[in-house]
């Protein structure tokens, strides 16, 4: 990715700190946590919480940007405590997930920021600790003082702060 910045193919990227080349400038945007999302018509939608047994017994949907992956951060957290879940659907975008959840009894674990404004869905805390993540914005020294780029980075930081839940 460093080469893409150096050649001007990428101006700003939203990354996690772990995936950011150390040669780039960075700015923290937000810290994210995970929640469970399910249809308001799901049999467990009236619960204030899900037990670990209930959670593991459900059919789950997973978002995997390359598509087809049936294993994610939730599965790593479950494996650490000797448990597993049943992922029966993998989609490549969070954009399609809410509609799928509305019309099925699938449960999904999603970043909390993406569970805001989801009519017909219920948000519940996960029954186990699922490590969240941080998002940062990164840019190359080539554009560090460029007024247009500074403006863009300020707008991105401002928008990241306005998303509250």
Residue ranges and their predicted role:
Residues 1-2, 90-97:
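Short helix-initiation/N-cap motifs at beta->coil->alpha
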Residues 8-9, 32, 47, 57-58, ...:
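Structured helix-beta-strand junction loops
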Residues 10-23, 72, 80, 94-122:
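A ligand-binding cleft/hinge motif common to bilobed small-molecule-binding domains
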Residues 24-40, 48, 52-57, 126-135:
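Short Pro/Gly-enriched coil loops immediately N-terminal to beta-strands
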Residues 44-46, 50-52, 58-81, 145-149, ...:
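Secondary-structure junction motif
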Residues 47, 52, 123-165:
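A late-sequence structural motif
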